[in-house]
């Protein structure tokens, strides 16, 4: 992304000059990302932590360097942190305020909808092997929230995984980002018709159907759609096979549609973070984007798509449960868990002679 280019440049120059370049370039990710938003996130996290009792706080907070920070997943399993289920009438509003700060209004709505699907699964599964509970979603803090130091927040549970990492004055990152939906479409009960990821599915299918035969031959990969996202819950990922139709091979209208898909998937995040991601994609060159599809093209067909650029990967898979179960992830090759900004942060501290141990 845009921040990665600057990171590589800054490694080669003295700290004072590097800091000057950072301030002049005013990258949306690191500098504008925005201090006001960062301050709001710090305040919301602090208020939430202050609402916890000593025992809860001990479980909610880890050292920033703890291995647990990278231990992410999207399946129903036991987790570290404090769950929404155990919060009282004073604490729960603080957690809600925190999530509304870290997510866009649409993102918060989607998280609530994903949680509501746990009730649907509880109703339709017979002798299910997983515990289904809309309140088994956990908040975990790593480090001490501040503008100067490094810290992180994780919000995670079945089919939700959000990771925000703050690297001192260098900014914040917001991946891995995962949202899933099971069922993808609710077909019975009070929530009949709910499709949490409708736009993310429909926009991509519309792009697929707009392709000519010649374009489709490039965009649609042979074989069946994979049974899940290829990168799974890997802690670090690299680019997948360079396949699919390239941005320059699309018409202007199709190019716009591709960018709409990307922005829609980013838009669970606050507007400032969305703007940073889109700016980074454009800085790395939209001509380097590729869109690939596997599986059938009709609603109800098992299918998979991915969008890949030099610095990021989006994977979408809807094959499980008779193609009614979506997994959708956004990964950043350099920036997941703040790796790029943390390297820059530690280098800057070291060059300033402050002797950071990392």
Predicted regions and their residues:
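Bacterial N-terminal signal peptides that target proteins for export
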Residues: 2-15
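Short, intrinsically disordered low-complexity segments
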Residues: 7-10, 25, 342
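Bacterial N-terminal signal peptides
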Residues: 12-24
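Signal peptide processing junction and immediate N-terminal pro/mature segment
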Residues: 25-31
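A cross-kingdom marker for long, charged
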Residues: 31-104, 108-358
């Amino acid at each position: 992304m845009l921040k990665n280019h600057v990171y590589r440049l800054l490694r080669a120059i003295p700290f004072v000059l590097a800091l000057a370049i950072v301030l002049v370039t005013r990258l949306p990710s690191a500098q504008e990302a925005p201090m006001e938003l960062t301050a709001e996130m710090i305040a919301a996290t602090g208020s939430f932590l202050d609402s916890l009792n000593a025992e809860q706080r001990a479980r909610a907070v880890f050292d920033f360097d703890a291995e647990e920070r990278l231990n992410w997943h999207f399946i129903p399993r036991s987790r570290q942190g404090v769950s929404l289920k155990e919060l009282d009438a004073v604490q729960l509003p603080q957690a809600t305020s925190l999530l509304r700060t870290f997510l866009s209004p649409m993102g918060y709505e989607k998280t609530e909808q994903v949680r509501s699907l746990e009730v649907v699964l509880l109703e339709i599964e017979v002798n299910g092997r997983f515990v289904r509970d809309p309140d088994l979603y956990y908040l975990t803090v790593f480090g001490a929230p501040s503008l100067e130091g490094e810290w992180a927040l994780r919000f995670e549970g079945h089919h939700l995984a959000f990771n925000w990492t703050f690297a001192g004055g260098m900014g914040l990152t917001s991946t891995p980002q995962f949202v899933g939906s099971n069922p993808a479409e609710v077909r019975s009960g009070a929530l009949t018709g709910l499709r949490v990821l409708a736009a993310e599915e429909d926009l991509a299918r519309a792009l697929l159907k707009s392709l000519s035969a010649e374009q489709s031959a490039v965009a649609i990969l042979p074989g069946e759609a994979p049974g899940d996202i290829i990168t799974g819950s890997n802690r670090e990922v690299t680019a997948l096979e360079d396949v699919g139709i390239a941005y320059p091979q699309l018409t202007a209208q199709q190019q716009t549609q591709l960018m709409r898909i990307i922005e829609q998937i980013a838009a669970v995040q606050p507007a400032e973070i969305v703007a940073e991601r889109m700016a980074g994609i454009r800085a790395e060159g939209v001509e380097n984007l590729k869109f690939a599809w596997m599986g059938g093209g009709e609603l109800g067909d098992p299918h998979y798509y991915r969008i890949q650029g030099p610095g990021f990967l989006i994977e979408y898979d809807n094959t499980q449960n008779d193609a009614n179960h979506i997994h959708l992830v956004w990964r950043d090759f350099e920036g997941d868990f703040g790796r790029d900004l943390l390297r820059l942060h530690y280098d800057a501290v070291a060059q300033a002679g402050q002797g950071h141990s990392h």
